[in-house]
Amino acid sequence: MPRRQTTVDTHVHIWEMPPIAPIGPSAPNFTSKPKAHGNAELQLADMVANQVDKTVLVQTSFSTWDNEYVAASAIKYPDRFVSMGLVDPLDDKNAEQAVYWMDEREMQGFRFHPQYYSEVDILKRPENDAMFRQIEKRAGIVQIHNRPEHAHQLDYVAAKYPGITWLIDHMMYPEPNMAPDWDAYKPVLALAKHDNVLMKISDIHNRSESDEHPFSDMHDVIKMAMDAFGTNRVMWGTGYPGYHRVEHGWLSLADELKLVREGFGWLSSAEQDKYLGGNAMRIWNWNRE
């Protein structure tokens, strides 16, 4: 029997509730709060049920700047998880925080949200240079959550810090109304010129104007992104653990996998394997036991 390719979900938010872990905003005007936990064990059960081997855990925006629960979960289950945290881009001491989470709590990088800060280009902020230098020194990973109008910020830092691996979350949100020319999305595709920038092709159904699998109105832009970045620099990701997926408007994990395996018919078997896990196995350090 041929060996099954390792499947890696590169984007799942987990969280706990007080008193186990704090809940609260980590960005201006962010008021969302969960009603129940979405913990590591819920994600593990979902993975087992759907034959997903590994997951990149990402700190949520409603879990404060304290990354401890996410970091501890990855340390507890090193064969299953790695972790990505948050640090405050407006805190002038954030370099110290980045060093702590990477050196002491095994986090492999951080997520930033330029779209949450309308008054400042947070990635280009001079005060963040020390932080990015420390992340770069550790060959860290930074994932960027924003929209096409913020692509210029990633263009700047990807060139300035070539030792960081930069990830575009959720394709940077292309919308079907950008078709047929997709001019509004071209600044995102242009980021492929940086060899250290990769893209998570995820959250597809929430961008689609269709309610039906396989959300075909998104296929042209997915193909454009895969052509621009190449199948060695695209990765699969989802969103929330367990029942929280459907409850929060995401597809179930089974349907997320079905979308790729049945809906992305243009991918060869080898390309699908790279997208669903091979590339992620190369980007993160999974040898931590």
Each language-model region and where it sits:
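Catalytic pocket-lining loop regions of alpha/beta-barrel enzymes
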Residues: D121-W236, H244, R282, R288
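Short beta->alpha connector loops
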Residues: S61-T64, V87-D92, Q115-Y116, N146-A151, ...
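Mid-to-C-terminal alpha-helical segments outside catalytic/metal-binding sites
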Residues: P2-T10, P19, S26, T31-K54, ...
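Short, acidic/polar
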Residues: A36-D46, D91-M102, D183-A184
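Conserved, mostly hydrophobic/aromatic
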Residues: H11, M47, V70, F110, ...
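Divalent metal-dependent hydrolysis catalytic cores, especially in the metallo-beta-lactamase
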Residues: A27-F62, R80-D88, Q108-Q115, V142
